[in-house]
Regions:
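Beta-strand-rich recognition/accessory modules
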Residues: 1-18, 28, 106, 118, ...
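Extended, loop-rich substrate-binding clefts of extracytoplasmic carbohydrate-active enzymes
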Residues: 3, 7, 75-127
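Hydrophobic residues embedded in beta-strands of well-ordered beta-sheets
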Residues: 11-13, 32, 97-99, 130-132, ...
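Hydrophobic residues positioned within well-ordered beta-strands of beta-sheet architectures
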Residues: 13, 23, 99-101, 119-121, ...
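Short acidic/polar mixed-charge low-complexity motifs
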Residues: 19-21, 31, 40-42, 115-117, ...
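Acidic-aromatic substrate-binding/catalytic surfaces of carbohydrate-active enzymes
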Residues: 21-76
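Asparagine-centered strand-capping/turn motif at beta-strand->loop junctions
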Residues: 134-140, 277
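Active-site/ligand-binding surface loops and adjacent short beta/alpha elements
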Residues: 142-225
Length: 278
């Protein structure tokens, strides 16, 4: 089943399976706001968001495009997350539903970034699983399209002190807080601000949150995985986060941080992230 609804003033589409799994997608930014599976909310969404229709939304799954963070001249994490996308038809598949949400270059985007493009996020819901697939088309006739970005997924956890992430062991690691390069431990634990970029692992990651386990996979077309938690001190400085918000979330992002992805004229690129309750 699919329904249209207004959530905090934003136009949204909700997909619901017969077993109770649901996903809520806002047209602002093609932003996944909620994913409920096996009776539990799996994504963290800050209660302190402004919900004004153009400010970035803290939580859920922001689509960062065509720039990661502040690594360029565009607004932080690019313009896609603050821009209105267009919803397509909801499609019923074997065991699930999906919807495609599309952003095309227009006068506003071209004023910031002189590049013709089409970006599409497919949100696919099946029992116990959410698959997000970002496709970027270069609609220029001659020039290459270069971009960085991420699916900046905020996962909900009961208590960050009792949470660990496995699967990145021995992968090259950049600790952005200390600006130190190294290799990852077999299991990551979170005590204070944590902001690290890893060479993407070929195998699934496992998030252990008390008695709950979530598998996290990404396509090899993403170069990196980013793991982020602001910790108590930094969280207290974020106006769109409650003081204890850090204790209930962990970002695990499919990302392209350093070297831009290059799409030839008329070509396209596909990158996905899959979350599975296990």
């Amino acid at each position: 089943m699919s329904t249209s609804e207004i959530y905090q003033g934003l136009a949204c589409h909700r997909l619901t399976l017969s077993g109770g799994d649901t996903v809520l997608v806002a047209m602002q930014g093609a932003h996944v706001l909620s994913w409920v599976s096996q009776g539990r909310e799996r994504l963290y969404l800050s209660p302190n968001n402004r919900w004004d229709g153009h400010s970035a939304i803290r939580g859920g799954v922001p689509v960062c495009f065509p720039q990661f963070n502040q690594r360029g001249t565009l607004p932080k994490h690019g313009f896609a997350r603050n821009t209105l996308w267009q919803a397509g038809e909801v499609v019923t598949t074997e065991g699930g539903l999906h919807i495609d949400v599309t952003l095309r270059a227009d006068a506003d985007t071209l004023a910031m970034w002189p590049q013709h493009f089409e970006a599409q996020l497919r949100v696919a819901l099946t029992p116990g699983q959410l698959l997000l697939t970002l496709t970027v088309h270069n609609t220029e006739a001659q020039q290459d399209l270069l971009f960085t970005g991420a699916l900046h997924t905020y996962l909900a956890v009961d208590d960050i002190d009792l949470t660990d992430l496995q699967g990145l062991g021995l992968r090259p690691e950049w600790d952005a807080v200390a600006d130190v390069h190294g290799v990852a431990d077999a299991a990551l634990y979170f005590d204070g601000e944590f902001d690290r970029v890893y060479d993407a692992a070929p195998q699934p990651l496992t998030l252990q949150d008390g008695s709950s386990t979530l598998q996290i996979e990404q396509s090899p077309s993403w170069g990196q995985s980013v793991v982020w938690n602001p910790g108590a001190e930094k969280c207290a400085t974020l106006p769109d986060m409650p003081a204890d918000g850090f204790a209930h979330m962990l970002c695990v992002e499919a990302a392209q941080v350093f070297e831009p992805i290059s799409i030839p004229a008329g070509g396209h690129w596909v990158g996905w992230q899959r979350l599975t309750v296990s």
